[in-house]
Amino acid sequence: MSPLSDSDLLAAADAVAARAYAPYSSFHVGCAVLARDGRVIEGVNVENAAYPLGVCAERTAFSRAVAEGYRPGDFVAAASTASPCGGCRQWLQEMGVERVVFRNGGRVVTMTPDELLPESFDSSKLS
């Protein structure tokens, strides 16, 4: 089996975005996370009438992965249909993803979590 390309991973994020629950903004976001074992775990944004209670696609993908037994460091890449928000950048850092692929306007961008969130907060700051 050949490794999944970043463009394939982004295509998976595009496909799952159609299942987002975004009745208020109509802004559908999908995320596909590639685990080291080759599995792709998907997530979508889920809005709520009480706006702060909505959940981003990246967080639903990682929450699903953790519920299924994955842990930080088990992930190779994450692809999102939009530039990750600040909170999701922190999640990408925490989960130990090697690279993040996303659309920003008409461009496809690939960055590391450190590039997305320089000087990030991590567990080393807790001691």
Which functions belong to the PLM regions below?
Residues 5, 23-25, 49-53:
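Alpha-helix N-cap/loop-to-helix boundary motif
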Residues 8-22:
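Short, basic/aromatic recognition patches
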Residues 25-35:
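Short beta-strand scaffold segments in enzyme catalytic cores
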Residues 1-11, 104:
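Short, compositionally biased leader-like segments
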Residues 42-126:
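Zn2+-dependent cytidine deaminase-like catalytic core
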Residues 20-25, 43-45:
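Short N-terminal helix-initiation segments at or just after the protein's N-terminus
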Residues 13, 31-32, 61, 65:
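Small-residue (primarily alanine) positions within well-ordered alpha-helices
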